[in-house]
Curated annotation (Swiss-Prot):
Belongs to the vasopressin/oxytocin family. It comes from Catostomus commersonii (White sucker). GO terms for cellular component: extracellular space; secretory granule. InterPro entries: Neurhyp_horm, Neurhyp_horm_dom_sf, Neurohypophysial_hormone_CS. The lineage of its organism: Eukaryota, Metazoa, Chordata, Craniata, Vertebrata. SMART domains: NH (SM00003). Disulfide bonds join C20-C25, C40-C84, C43-C57, C51-C74, C58-C64, C91-C103, C97-C115, C104-C109. It comes from the Eukaryota. It is found in: Secreted. Keywords: Amidation, Cleavage on pair of basic residues, Disulfide bond, Hormone, Secreted, Signal. The modification Glycine amide is found at G28. Residues 1-19 form the signal peptide. GO terms for molecular function: neurohypophyseal hormone activity. This is Vasotocin-neurophysin VT 1.
Amino acid sequence: MSDSFLPTCILCLLALSSACYIQNCPRGGKRSQPDTSRECVSCGPGNAGRCYGPSICCGAALGCLVGSPETMSCMEENHLPSPCETGGRPCGDEGRCAAPGVCCDSVSCVMDSECLEDVRSDQSEDPSRLKTVSGEILLRLLNLASRGRRDF
């Protein structure tokens, strides 16, 4: 009986200990894979901004939009498997400079004088695209102003 007891105990211990090992790790360990940092989803008029939270869209040319229809594309950020990089300098407790004078985290935005200095715009923002967005906004304002004059 003792001859079969020892191999049985070893077999049981082996079975129990192999259940404790993580089986789905990549070769070389979890830190062997390169960081897959990506930019956050584009949002706002002309996709000129980046998502800072599920309902926050900010860009250097447009400021910050919170809870507006332009932020709907930011909701899909919650469903993506990897985190994103918003860009900008760190500010506040856990925020980043999102627009000139504005510091945002994933939940809210606050005015912050640290962000008045040289806000780093997103790498993918094309200056010609920003000009067209600014031009679109200016044209809309002019159209609204001219409509207001005709009504009087």
